[in-house]
Amino acid sequence: METMPNWLMQRAFLTPDRTAIEIEEEKVTFVQLHEKVVSVCEHLTHVGVKRAQKVAVLMKNGMEMITVIHALSYIGAVAVLLNTRLSREELLWQMDDAEVVCLVTDQEFETENVPVCSFAEVMQGPKAEAFIQEEFSLEEAMTIIYTSGTTGKPKGVILTYGNHWASAVGSSLNLGLRDDDCWLACMPMFHVGGLSLLMKNIMYGMRILLVPKYDANFIHKALQTRGVTIISVVSKMLTDLLERLGEGTYPSSLRCMLLGGGPAPKPLLETCVEKGIPVYQTYGMTETSSQICTLTADYMLTKVGSAGKPLFQCQLRIEKDGVVVPPRAEGEIVVKGPNVTGGYFNREDATHEAIRNGWLHTGDLGYLDEEGFLYVLDRRSDLIISGGENIYPAQIEEVLLSHPAVVEAGVVGMADESWGQVPAAFVVKSGDVTEEEIIRFCEEKLAKYKVPKKACFLEELPRNASKKLLRRELRKLVEEM
């Protein structure tokens, strides 16, 4: 059984006085963070948290959540990270599914299903001597994070210490490390993209500027004034920042904007190229502990729209009906690597369906070019099949977003008696534009069968906490038409 020293303890020993976390005006060094975590361990031990138990965490981004996540790893308990935007029923379902022994939260939450530990009350209560893991076994589960459930019930993705370690190592081999690196963290830590930054923070000894709640104005200013070198974003966040940037650009010290969350519209990427903003388009998911494929800035100009090549320890191929297809042929993206989950909690059927011979079948569609660069087309479940033709919503959204009066766009399939399905578009507009003009604009740029048959205007598009588009909500709107 392969082990490593407890990551935060080791970091506090190696670089105790280096800044670990900045939140607003508060700065915490690695040794101070370790001391805070030990204190949380002792309080959690008093309320009965033990090694190997599963503990639900329902908290917002902040020092409290950081210390709880680390404290559970110190104790050897498994952190089940819950999305704060879910309904009460959804949260209860996930806690029941994960078989948690208690819930640690910074919010009002009452239930008889599971003991609820208010973080503030726990910290005001007594302490008990805690047995702290000085070593981590890389094979043991560290976290369970539920997939967003874009199709069917969410599944609890088990990520081991080894998965998180491999993810951080793979990222560093790809993006490089600098002594002055500071990663601005604005993604929720209950999602793997946000959580992965906590892992990088202690493994790299890198400063994190944590934004408790998404605030585009604060982030825009911080990129200019707080020495930020790296930031993780999705397309919506990047669009918000570019709006605020206007004709300007960001300091050269900002060396990487890691762009994930699904295929990015080309007009957005081209704007970044024009402004010299170093966007690294990336592809990953909960099951891969964050990114598994990234396009470095070297190829920003020549491979616009690509998610790049696999991280150093990872492999990727495209399959159709179980057969690896040649370059440019579309199929399912299949990946393998030490950062890839071994399976879903209590879901052997789903695990066997998704992971075959060590390869994870992602359910995403894409192709590789002749040089091995990945182009992500869409989720297989989002595919619109119209009269036997495959239509990728992301392609139509890209066209819609190139219209000067469109700021957001989402496309889903709509039932049609003749064709089975036809595209329907949902648009957030910034100026005067009609449904007819939108459809006419698409007719000039798309094959006839890809042109939306309806274009509906919304004040905003439904998105999850990571700002990813929720197509299932758009499908509900279509059904109500």
Swiss-Prot record:
Converts 2-succinylbenzoate (OSB) to 2-succinylbenzoyl-CoA (OSB-CoA). Belongs to the ATP-dependent AMP-binding enzyme family. MenE subfamily. Gene3D superfamilies: 3.30.300.30, N-terminal domain of ligase-like. The keyword Transcription does not apply. This is 2-succinylbenzoate--CoA ligase. Signal peptide: none annotated. One of its GO terms (biological process) is menaquinone biosynthetic process. The gene is menE. It comes from the Bacteria. GO terms for molecular function: ATP binding; o-succinylbenzoate-CoA ligase activity.
